Amino acid sequence: MMTNATGERNLALIQEVLEVFPETARKERRKHMMVSDPKMKSVGKCIISNRKSQPGVMTVRGCAYAGSKGVVFGPIKDMAHISHGPAGCGQYSRAERRNYYTGVSGVDSFGTLNFTSDFQERDIVFGGDKKLSKLIEEMELLFPLTKGITIQSECPVGLIGDDISAVANASSKALDKPVIPVRCEGFRGVSQSLGHHIANDVVRDWILNNREGQPFETTPYDVAIIGDYNIGGDAWASRILLEEMGLRVVAQWSGDGTLVEMENTPFVKLNLVHCYRSMNYIARHMEEKHQIPWMEYNFFGPTKIAESLRKIADQFDDTIRANAEAVIARYEGQMAAIIAKYRPRLEGRKVLLYMGGLRPRHVIGAYEDLGMEIIAAGYEFAHNDDYDRTLPDLKEGTLLFDDASSYELEAFVKALKPDLIGSGIKEKYIFQKMGVPFRQMHSWDYSGPYHGYDGFAIFARDMDMTLNNPAWNELTAPWLKSA
Protein backbone atom coordinates (compact mmCIF):
# COMPACT_ATOMS: atom_id res chain seq x y z
CA MET A 1 0.00 0.00 0.00
CA MET A 2 1.45 3.37 -1.03
CA THR A 3 2.13 5.65 1.97
CA ASN A 4 4.26 8.27 0.19
CA ALA A 5 2.35 11.58 -0.03
CA THR A 6 3.18 11.98 -3.72
CA GLY A 7 1.97 8.47 -4.38
CA GLU A 8 -1.30 9.05 -2.53
CA ARG A 9 -1.85 12.23 -4.51
CA ASN A 10 -1.21 10.45 -7.80
CA LEU A 11 -3.51 7.56 -6.90
CA ALA A 12 -6.26 10.10 -6.25
CA LEU A 13 -5.40 11.81 -9.54
CA ILE A 14 -5.84 8.55 -11.44
CA GLN A 15 -9.31 8.08 -9.98
CA GLU A 16 -10.24 11.68 -10.71
CA VAL A 17 -9.08 11.56 -14.34
CA LEU A 18 -10.95 8.33 -15.03
CA GLU A 19 -14.25 9.53 -13.56
CA VAL A 20 -15.42 10.79 -16.96
CA PHE A 21 -15.35 7.32 -18.52
CA PRO A 22 -18.24 4.83 -18.49
CA GLU A 23 -17.76 2.10 -15.89
CA THR A 24 -16.44 -0.56 -18.29
CA ALA A 25 -13.94 1.78 -19.91
CA ARG A 26 -12.95 3.19 -16.52
CA LYS A 27 -12.14 -0.26 -15.15
CA GLU A 28 -10.14 -1.13 -18.26
CA ARG A 29 -8.13 2.09 -18.28
CA ARG A 30 -7.39 1.83 -14.54
CA LYS A 31 -5.33 -1.28 -15.30
CA HIS A 32 -2.96 0.86 -17.37
CA MET A 33 -1.97 3.26 -14.58
CA MET A 34 -0.06 2.95 -11.32
CA VAL A 35 2.32 4.78 -9.03
CA SER A 36 5.88 3.57 -8.63
CA ASP A 37 7.14 1.80 -5.55
CA PRO A 38 10.89 1.12 -5.21
CA LYS A 39 10.14 -1.99 -3.16
CA MET A 40 8.55 -3.64 -6.19
CA LYS A 41 10.81 -5.82 -8.34
CA SER A 42 8.12 -6.20 -11.00
CA VAL A 43 4.96 -4.34 -11.90
CA GLY A 44 3.19 -7.70 -11.99
CA LYS A 45 -0.52 -7.05 -12.42
CA CYS A 46 -0.28 -3.46 -11.18
CA ILE A 47 -0.12 -2.27 -14.76
CA ILE A 48 -1.27 -3.98 -17.95
CA SER A 49 0.30 -3.18 -21.31
CA ASN A 50 0.48 -4.32 -24.94
CA ARG A 51 -3.31 -4.48 -25.16
CA LYS A 52 -5.66 -3.12 -27.81
CA SER A 53 -6.48 0.54 -27.34
CA GLN A 54 -10.03 1.32 -26.25
CA PRO A 55 -12.35 1.88 -29.24
CA GLY A 56 -13.12 5.56 -29.64
CA VAL A 57 -10.15 6.66 -27.56
CA MET A 58 -7.54 8.89 -29.22
CA THR A 59 -4.30 6.92 -28.99
CA VAL A 60 -0.91 8.07 -30.28
CA ARG A 61 0.25 4.56 -31.13
CA GLY A 62 1.50 3.54 -34.56
CA CYS A 63 0.86 0.35 -36.52
CA ALA A 64 2.78 -2.83 -37.36
CA TYR A 65 3.87 -1.35 -40.69
CA ALA A 66 5.34 1.64 -38.83
CA GLY A 67 7.26 -0.69 -36.53
CA SER A 68 8.76 -2.67 -39.39
CA LYS A 69 9.34 -0.14 -42.15
CA GLY A 70 9.59 3.02 -40.10
CA VAL A 71 11.80 1.61 -37.34
CA VAL A 72 13.66 -1.63 -38.06
CA PHE A 73 14.14 -1.84 -41.83
CA GLY A 74 13.78 1.75 -43.05
CA PRO A 75 17.19 2.99 -41.83
CA ILE A 76 19.14 0.15 -43.55
CA LYS A 77 20.68 2.47 -46.09
CA ASP A 78 21.88 0.23 -48.93
CA MET A 79 18.56 -1.56 -49.35
CA ALA A 80 15.43 -0.19 -51.03
CA HIS A 81 12.27 -0.61 -48.97
CA ILE A 82 9.03 -0.79 -50.94
CA SER A 83 5.87 0.44 -49.24
CA HIS A 84 3.51 -1.98 -50.96
CA GLY A 85 0.08 -0.38 -50.87
CA PRO A 86 -1.31 3.19 -50.98
CA ALA A 87 1.26 5.97 -51.33
CA GLY A 88 0.46 7.74 -48.06
CA CYS A 89 1.96 5.17 -45.68
CA GLY A 90 5.30 5.30 -47.42
CA GLN A 91 5.34 9.08 -47.50
CA TYR A 92 4.49 9.46 -43.82
CA SER A 93 7.17 6.93 -42.83
CA ARG A 94 9.82 8.48 -45.06
CA ALA A 95 12.66 10.29 -43.28
CA GLU A 96 10.53 11.48 -40.36
CA ARG A 97 12.83 9.82 -37.80
CA ARG A 98 15.97 11.58 -39.04
CA ASN A 99 18.00 8.37 -39.39
CA TYR A 100 21.31 9.93 -40.42
CA TYR A 101 23.53 7.99 -42.82
CA THR A 102 26.63 8.42 -44.94
CA GLY A 103 26.50 7.91 -48.69
CA VAL A 104 24.89 9.49 -51.72
CA SER A 105 21.10 9.38 -51.67
CA GLY A 106 19.71 7.59 -54.71
CA VAL A 107 23.11 6.16 -55.68
CA ASP A 108 24.31 3.90 -52.87
CA SER A 109 21.97 4.98 -50.05
CA PHE A 110 18.19 4.88 -50.25
CA GLY A 111 16.80 5.51 -46.76
CA THR A 112 15.14 8.84 -47.52
CA LEU A 113 13.46 7.73 -50.76
CA ASN A 114 9.81 6.67 -50.92
CA PHE A 115 9.38 3.54 -53.05
CA THR A 116 5.67 2.76 -53.30
CA SER A 117 3.42 0.61 -55.46
CA ASP A 118 0.78 3.37 -55.16
CA PHE A 119 -2.22 1.04 -54.81
CA GLN A 120 -5.39 2.21 -56.54
CA GLU A 121 -8.93 0.81 -56.54
CA ARG A 122 -8.21 -1.44 -59.53
CA ASP A 123 -5.30 -3.01 -57.63
CA ILE A 124 -7.64 -3.91 -54.79
CA VAL A 125 -9.99 -5.57 -57.28
CA PHE A 126 -7.48 -7.36 -59.50
CA GLY A 127 -4.52 -7.74 -57.12
CA GLY A 128 -1.15 -6.04 -57.08
CA ASP A 129 1.32 -8.88 -57.74
CA LYS A 130 2.00 -7.93 -61.37
CA LYS A 131 2.36 -4.29 -60.45
CA LEU A 132 4.82 -5.21 -57.69
CA SER A 133 6.92 -7.32 -60.07
CA LYS A 134 7.06 -4.45 -62.57
CA LEU A 135 7.98 -2.02 -59.82
CA ILE A 136 10.93 -4.17 -58.74
CA GLU A 137 12.14 -4.42 -62.35
CA GLU A 138 12.01 -0.63 -62.72
CA MET A 139 13.81 -0.11 -59.40
CA GLU A 140 16.66 -2.35 -60.51
CA LEU A 141 16.98 -0.34 -63.72
CA LEU A 142 16.96 3.03 -61.93
CA PHE A 143 18.88 2.05 -58.78
CA PRO A 144 21.23 -0.81 -59.70
CA LEU A 145 23.47 -0.35 -56.64
CA THR A 146 20.86 -1.50 -54.13
CA LYS A 147 22.17 -4.49 -52.17
CA GLY A 148 18.67 -5.82 -51.65
CA ILE A 149 14.99 -4.95 -51.51
CA THR A 150 12.33 -5.41 -48.84
CA ILE A 151 8.61 -5.47 -49.56
CA GLN A 152 6.77 -3.86 -46.65
CA SER A 153 3.12 -4.80 -47.04
CA GLU A 154 0.39 -2.36 -46.03
CA CYS A 155 -3.18 -3.08 -44.93
CA PRO A 156 -4.87 -3.58 -48.34
CA VAL A 157 -2.28 -6.17 -49.37
CA GLY A 158 -3.12 -8.32 -46.38
CA LEU A 159 -6.85 -7.86 -46.83
CA ILE A 160 -6.87 -9.05 -50.45
CA GLY A 161 -4.32 -11.82 -49.84
CA ASP A 162 -1.63 -10.95 -52.39
CA ASP A 163 1.23 -13.47 -52.44
CA ILE A 164 4.21 -11.15 -51.96
CA SER A 165 6.43 -14.10 -51.03
CA ALA A 166 6.05 -15.60 -54.51
CA VAL A 167 6.86 -12.24 -56.12
CA ALA A 168 9.87 -11.83 -53.82
CA ASN A 169 11.26 -15.28 -54.64
CA ALA A 170 10.85 -14.82 -58.39
CA SER A 171 12.37 -11.33 -58.31
CA SER A 172 15.28 -12.44 -56.15
CA LYS A 173 16.21 -15.14 -58.67
CA ALA A 174 15.88 -12.74 -61.59
CA LEU A 175 17.97 -9.99 -59.99
CA ASP A 176 20.42 -12.23 -58.11
CA LYS A 177 20.01 -10.18 -54.94
CA PRO A 178 17.85 -10.53 -51.82
CA VAL A 179 14.22 -9.51 -52.23
CA ILE A 180 12.61 -9.96 -48.84
CA PRO A 181 8.85 -10.07 -48.11
CA VAL A 182 7.72 -8.53 -44.81
CA ARG A 183 4.09 -9.22 -43.85
CA CYS A 184 3.69 -6.16 -41.64
CA GLU A 185 0.17 -5.04 -42.53
CA GLY A 186 -0.81 -2.19 -40.24
CA PHE A 187 -3.94 -3.86 -38.87
CA ARG A 188 -1.90 -6.69 -37.32
CA GLY A 189 -1.28 -6.57 -33.59
CA VAL A 190 -2.09 -3.73 -31.21
CA SER A 191 0.70 -1.25 -32.02
CA GLN A 192 4.01 -0.80 -33.80
CA SER A 193 5.47 -3.29 -31.33
CA LEU A 194 4.27 -6.27 -33.37
CA GLY A 195 5.92 -4.69 -36.42
CA HIS A 196 9.24 -4.76 -34.56
CA HIS A 197 8.73 -8.43 -33.79
CA ILE A 198 7.75 -9.30 -37.36
CA ALA A 199 10.79 -7.46 -38.71
CA ASN A 200 13.08 -9.23 -36.22
CA ASP A 201 11.72 -12.58 -37.37
CA VAL A 202 12.35 -11.62 -41.00
CA VAL A 203 15.94 -10.63 -40.17
CA ARG A 204 16.34 -14.00 -38.46
CA ASP A 205 14.93 -16.01 -41.38
CA TRP A 206 16.21 -14.05 -44.39
CA ILE A 207 19.44 -12.28 -43.38
CA LEU A 208 21.37 -13.63 -40.39
CA ASN A 209 22.11 -17.02 -41.97
CA ASN A 210 23.42 -15.63 -45.26
CA ARG A 211 27.11 -15.82 -44.30
CA GLU A 212 26.95 -18.95 -42.18
CA GLY A 213 30.03 -21.09 -42.77
CA GLN A 214 31.86 -18.35 -44.66
CA PRO A 215 35.26 -17.07 -43.47
CA PHE A 216 35.26 -13.91 -41.35
CA GLU A 217 38.27 -12.46 -39.55
CA THR A 218 37.33 -11.93 -35.91
CA THR A 219 38.98 -10.38 -32.85
CA PRO A 220 38.25 -10.91 -29.13
CA TYR A 221 36.74 -7.42 -29.01
CA ASP A 222 34.07 -7.58 -31.72
CA VAL A 223 30.70 -6.06 -30.82
CA ALA A 224 27.51 -5.05 -32.63
CA ILE A 225 25.32 -2.04 -31.91
CA ILE A 226 21.71 -3.12 -32.37
CA GLY A 227 18.63 -0.94 -32.06
CA ASP A 228 20.30 2.46 -32.36
CA TYR A 229 18.56 4.25 -35.21
CA ASN A 230 21.10 7.09 -35.43
CA ILE A 231 18.56 9.81 -34.75
CA GLY A 232 20.48 13.02 -35.33
CA GLY A 233 23.73 11.03 -35.29
CA ASP A 234 23.21 9.14 -31.99
CA ALA A 235 24.89 5.92 -33.12
CA TRP A 236 27.97 7.79 -34.29
CA ALA A 237 28.32 9.50 -30.89
CA SER A 238 27.97 6.10 -29.17
CA ARG A 239 30.34 4.30 -31.50
CA ILE A 240 33.12 6.77 -30.70
CA LEU A 241 33.11 5.71 -27.04
CA LEU A 242 33.12 1.99 -27.80
CA GLU A 243 36.04 2.36 -30.19
CA GLU A 244 37.93 4.60 -27.74
CA MET A 245 37.77 1.80 -25.15
CA GLY A 246 39.28 -0.65 -27.64
CA LEU A 247 36.24 -2.48 -29.01
CA ARG A 248 35.72 -3.17 -32.70
CA VAL A 249 32.21 -2.32 -33.90
CA VAL A 250 31.57 -4.95 -36.58
CA ALA A 251 27.94 -4.04 -37.16
CA GLN A 252 25.67 -1.11 -36.43
CA TRP A 253 21.99 -1.31 -37.30
CA SER A 254 19.55 -0.15 -38.17
CA GLY A 255 20.79 3.47 -38.15
CA ASP A 256 23.46 4.00 -40.85
CA GLY A 257 23.43 0.22 -41.21
CA THR A 258 24.05 -1.99 -44.22
CA LEU A 259 22.93 -5.44 -45.28
CA VAL A 260 26.42 -6.91 -44.92
CA GLU A 261 26.71 -5.57 -41.36
CA MET A 262 23.51 -7.39 -40.46
CA GLU A 263 24.84 -10.56 -42.09
CA ASN A 264 28.11 -10.28 -40.12
CA THR A 265 26.44 -9.82 -36.73
CA PRO A 266 26.48 -13.56 -35.82
CA PHE A 267 30.31 -13.36 -35.71
CA VAL A 268 30.52 -10.83 -32.86
CA LYS A 269 31.34 -11.55 -29.21
CA LEU A 270 28.70 -9.25 -27.67
CA ASN A 271 25.49 -7.64 -28.89
CA LEU A 272 24.85 -4.19 -27.42
CA VAL A 273 21.13 -3.44 -27.55
CA HIS A 274 20.08 0.17 -27.32
CA CYS A 275 16.33 -0.07 -28.02
CA TYR A 276 15.31 -3.13 -26.04
CA ARG A 277 11.67 -3.02 -27.11
CA SER A 278 12.33 -3.18 -30.85
CA MET A 279 15.38 -5.46 -30.95
CA ASN A 280 15.39 -7.79 -27.95
CA TYR A 281 13.86 -10.56 -30.07
CA ILE A 282 16.78 -10.83 -32.47
CA ALA A 283 19.29 -10.50 -29.63
CA ARG A 284 17.65 -13.41 -27.80
CA HIS A 285 17.68 -15.46 -31.00
CA MET A 286 21.42 -14.94 -31.48
CA GLU A 287 22.02 -15.81 -27.85
CA GLU A 288 20.15 -19.10 -28.29
CA LYS A 289 21.56 -20.07 -31.70
CA HIS A 290 25.05 -18.54 -31.68
CA GLN A 291 25.66 -18.24 -27.92
CA ILE A 292 26.28 -14.50 -28.28
CA PRO A 293 25.53 -12.69 -25.02
CA TRP A 294 23.67 -9.40 -25.18
CA MET A 295 23.04 -6.48 -22.88
CA GLU A 296 21.01 -3.30 -22.90
CA TYR A 297 23.05 -0.12 -22.53
CA ASN A 298 22.19 3.52 -21.87
CA PHE A 299 24.32 6.38 -23.20
CA PHE A 300 22.07 9.26 -22.06
CA GLY A 301 23.88 11.52 -19.60
CA PRO A 302 27.30 11.08 -17.94
CA THR A 303 26.05 9.02 -14.99
CA LYS A 304 24.41 6.35 -17.16
CA ILE A 305 27.22 6.48 -19.74
CA ALA A 306 29.83 5.66 -17.09
CA GLU A 307 27.61 2.92 -15.65
CA SER A 308 27.09 1.36 -19.09
CA LEU A 309 30.74 1.61 -20.15
CA ARG A 310 31.77 -0.27 -17.00
CA LYS A 311 29.13 -2.96 -17.54
CA ILE A 312 30.24 -3.40 -21.15
CA ALA A 313 33.90 -3.55 -20.10
CA ASP A 314 33.08 -6.25 -17.54
CA GLN A 315 32.22 -8.54 -20.46
CA PHE A 316 35.86 -8.37 -21.62
CA ASP A 317 39.35 -8.39 -20.09
CA ASP A 318 41.35 -6.05 -17.85
CA THR A 319 42.66 -4.13 -20.86
CA ILE A 320 39.15 -3.08 -21.87
CA ARG A 321 38.25 -2.32 -18.24
CA ALA A 322 41.25 -0.02 -17.93
CA ASN A 323 40.40 1.62 -21.24
CA ALA A 324 36.83 2.21 -20.10
CA GLU A 325 38.02 3.97 -16.96
CA ALA A 326 40.36 6.09 -19.07
CA VAL A 327 37.50 7.09 -21.37
CA ILE A 328 35.30 8.05 -18.42
CA ALA A 329 38.13 10.08 -16.87
CA ARG A 330 38.88 11.81 -20.17
CA TYR A 331 35.41 13.32 -20.36
CA GLU A 332 34.88 14.08 -16.65
CA GLY A 333 36.09 17.66 -16.86
CA GLN A 334 34.00 18.41 -19.94
CA MET A 335 30.87 16.95 -18.33
CA ALA A 336 31.49 18.82 -15.06
CA ALA A 337 31.71 22.09 -16.99
CA ILE A 338 28.43 21.39 -18.81
CA ILE A 339 26.65 20.53 -15.57
CA ALA A 340 28.09 23.61 -13.85
CA LYS A 341 26.78 25.77 -16.68
CA TYR A 342 23.28 24.36 -17.07
CA ARG A 343 22.29 22.76 -13.76
CA PRO A 344 21.76 26.07 -11.92
CA ARG A 345 19.37 27.10 -14.72
CA LEU A 346 17.45 23.80 -14.69
CA GLU A 347 17.62 22.61 -11.07
CA GLY A 348 14.30 21.51 -9.64
CA ARG A 349 12.34 21.71 -12.88
CA LYS A 350 9.68 19.01 -13.20
CA VAL A 351 9.39 16.81 -16.29
CA LEU A 352 6.59 14.61 -17.66
CA LEU A 353 7.64 12.00 -20.22
CA TYR A 354 5.43 10.11 -22.67
CA MET A 355 7.23 8.29 -25.46
CA GLY A 356 7.70 4.92 -27.09
CA GLY A 357 10.50 2.37 -27.14
CA LEU A 358 13.11 2.91 -24.45
CA ARG A 359 13.21 6.65 -23.87
CA PRO A 360 10.90 7.11 -20.86
CA ARG A 361 13.46 5.20 -18.77
CA HIS A 362 16.70 5.91 -20.64
CA VAL A 363 16.52 9.71 -20.46
CA ILE A 364 15.73 9.85 -16.72
CA GLY A 365 19.42 9.82 -15.75
CA ALA A 366 20.28 12.62 -18.16
CA TYR A 367 17.56 14.85 -16.71
CA GLU A 368 18.68 14.02 -13.17
CA ASP A 369 22.28 14.89 -14.06
CA LEU A 370 20.91 18.39 -14.70
CA GLY A 371 19.00 18.45 -11.42
CA MET A 372 15.59 17.95 -13.01
CA GLU A 373 12.86 15.72 -11.56
CA ILE A 374 10.73 13.17 -13.41
CA ILE A 375 7.22 13.41 -11.98
CA ALA A 376 5.43 11.13 -14.48
CA ALA A 377 6.42 8.69 -17.21
CA GLY A 378 4.43 6.74 -19.76
CA TYR A 379 4.95 4.46 -22.73
CA GLU A 380 2.95 4.34 -25.94
CA PHE A 381 3.49 0.66 -26.76
CA ALA A 382 5.50 -0.91 -23.96
CA HIS A 383 5.27 -4.44 -22.62
CA ASN A 384 5.33 -5.22 -18.92
CA ASP A 385 9.06 -5.96 -18.93
CA ASP A 386 9.64 -2.35 -20.05
CA TYR A 387 7.87 -1.15 -16.92
CA ASP A 388 9.90 -3.60 -14.83
CA ARG A 389 13.07 -2.02 -16.23
CA THR A 390 11.73 1.46 -15.52
CA LEU A 391 10.82 1.02 -11.84
CA PRO A 392 14.40 1.21 -10.45
CA ASP A 393 14.93 4.63 -12.04
CA LEU A 394 11.76 6.24 -10.67
CA LYS A 395 11.27 7.89 -7.31
CA GLU A 396 8.59 6.55 -5.00
CA GLY A 397 5.11 7.69 -5.95
CA THR A 398 5.90 8.71 -9.52
CA LEU A 399 2.92 8.41 -11.85
CA LEU A 400 3.35 5.62 -14.43
CA PHE A 401 0.89 5.16 -17.30
CA ASP A 402 0.43 3.12 -20.48
CA ASP A 403 -1.10 4.06 -23.87
CA ALA A 404 -2.58 7.30 -22.55
CA SER A 405 -5.39 8.95 -24.47
CA SER A 406 -5.22 12.61 -25.45
CA TYR A 407 -7.70 13.44 -22.71
CA GLU A 408 -5.76 11.56 -20.02
CA LEU A 409 -2.47 13.17 -20.97
CA GLU A 410 -3.94 16.67 -20.90
CA ALA A 411 -5.60 15.95 -17.55
CA PHE A 412 -2.32 14.71 -16.06
CA VAL A 413 -0.50 17.80 -17.30
CA LYS A 414 -3.12 20.18 -15.88
CA ALA A 415 -2.98 18.44 -12.49
CA LEU A 416 0.77 17.83 -12.19
CA LYS A 417 1.84 21.16 -13.72
CA PRO A 418 5.17 20.01 -15.20
CA ASP A 419 7.71 22.61 -16.26
CA LEU A 420 8.63 20.54 -19.32
CA ILE A 421 6.99 17.79 -21.36
CA GLY A 422 9.00 15.32 -23.41
CA SER A 423 6.79 13.49 -25.90
CA GLY A 424 6.07 13.15 -29.64
CA ILE A 425 5.02 15.26 -32.59
CA LYS A 426 1.30 14.52 -32.09
CA GLU A 427 1.41 16.08 -28.63
CA LYS A 428 3.86 18.91 -29.27
CA TYR A 429 1.62 21.68 -30.55
CA ILE A 430 -1.25 20.99 -28.15
CA PHE A 431 0.94 21.59 -25.12
CA GLN A 432 2.90 24.45 -26.63
CA LYS A 433 -0.41 26.23 -27.24
CA MET A 434 -1.23 25.57 -23.59
CA GLY A 435 1.94 27.47 -22.70
CA VAL A 436 3.95 24.45 -21.55
CA PRO A 437 7.57 24.10 -22.77
CA PHE A 438 7.90 20.95 -24.87
CA ARG A 439 10.66 18.84 -26.41
CA GLN A 440 9.86 16.42 -29.23
CA MET A 441 11.76 13.42 -27.89
CA HIS A 442 11.18 11.02 -30.78
CA SER A 443 13.45 12.88 -33.19
CA TRP A 444 15.12 15.28 -30.73
CA ASP A 445 13.12 18.22 -32.12
CA TYR A 446 15.42 18.31 -35.16
CA SER A 447 18.52 18.54 -32.99
CA GLY A 448 20.88 15.89 -31.68
CA PRO A 449 22.73 13.72 -31.18
CA TYR A 450 21.70 13.16 -27.55
CA HIS A 451 23.70 9.94 -27.01
CA GLY A 452 27.21 9.84 -25.61
CA TYR A 453 29.28 12.59 -24.07
CA ASP A 454 29.02 14.70 -27.22
CA GLY A 455 25.26 14.28 -27.13
CA PHE A 456 24.87 15.32 -23.49
CA ALA A 457 26.28 18.76 -24.27
CA ILE A 458 23.58 19.21 -26.92
CA PHE A 459 20.87 17.72 -24.68
CA ALA A 460 21.68 20.14 -21.85
CA ARG A 461 21.76 23.11 -24.21
CA ASP A 462 18.41 22.14 -25.74
CA MET A 463 16.67 21.70 -22.38
CA ASP A 464 17.94 25.10 -21.25
CA MET A 465 17.00 26.69 -24.57
CA THR A 466 13.47 25.26 -24.29
CA LEU A 467 12.74 26.03 -20.66
CA ASN A 468 14.42 29.43 -20.45
CA ASN A 469 13.31 30.75 -23.82
CA PRO A 470 11.95 34.30 -23.31
CA ALA A 471 9.09 33.47 -25.68
CA TRP A 472 7.35 31.67 -22.81
CA ASN A 473 6.98 35.05 -21.09
CA GLU A 474 4.42 35.86 -23.77
CA LEU A 475 2.32 32.76 -22.96
CA THR A 476 0.66 31.68 -19.75
CA ALA A 477 -0.16 28.10 -18.86
CA PRO A 478 -3.88 27.58 -18.12
CA TRP A 479 -3.31 26.89 -14.41
CA LEU A 480 -1.36 30.16 -14.01
CA LYS A 481 -4.11 32.37 -15.43
CA SER A 482 -6.15 34.43 -13.01
CA ALA A 483 -9.85 33.60 -12.84
Curated annotation (Swiss-Prot):
Q: What is this enzyme's class at the first EC digit?
A: oxidoreductase
Does the entry annotate any disulfide bonds, and if so which pairs? none
Enzyme Commission no: 1.18.6.1
Which SUPFAM superfamilies does this chain map to?
Helical backbone' metal receptor
The cofactor remark states: Binds 1 [8Fe-7S] cluster per heterodimer. Binds 1 [7Fe-Mo-9S-C-homocitryl] cluster per subunit.
> Where does the chain bind [8Fe-7S] cluster?
63, 89, 155
Q: Which UniProt keywords apply?
A: ATP-binding, Iron, Iron-sulfur, Metal-binding, Molybdenum, Nitrogen fixation, Nucleotide-binding, Oxidoreductase
GO MF: ATP binding; iron-sulfur cluster binding; metal ion binding; nitrogenase activity
This enzyme catalyses:
N2 + 8 reduced [2Fe-2S]-[ferredoxin] + 16 ATP + 16 H2O = H2 + 8 oxidized [2Fe-2S]-[ferredoxin] + 2 NH4(+) + 16 ADP + 16 phosphate + 6 H(+)
Family matches, as Pfam families? Oxidored_nitro
How is this protein annotated for GO cellular component? molybdenum-iron nitrogenase complex
- CC cofactor: [8Fe-7S] cluster; [7Fe-Mo-9S-C-homocitryl] cluster
- Which BP terms does GO give this entry? nitrogen fixation
Q: Which residues bind [7Fe-Mo-9S-C-homocitryl] cluster?
A: 275, 442
Q: Its biological function? A: This molybdenum-iron protein is part of the nitrogenase complex that catalyzes the key enzymatic reactions in nitrogen fixation.
Family in the record: Belongs to the NifD/NifK/NifE/NifN family.
Q: How does it assemble?
A: Tetramer of two alpha and two beta chains. Forms complex with the iron protein (nitrogenase component 2).
Protein name (record): Nitrogenase molybdenum-iron protein alpha chain
Instruction: Give the organism's phylogenetic lineage.
Output: Bacteria, Pseudomonadati, Pseudomonadota, Gammaproteobacteria, Enterobacterales
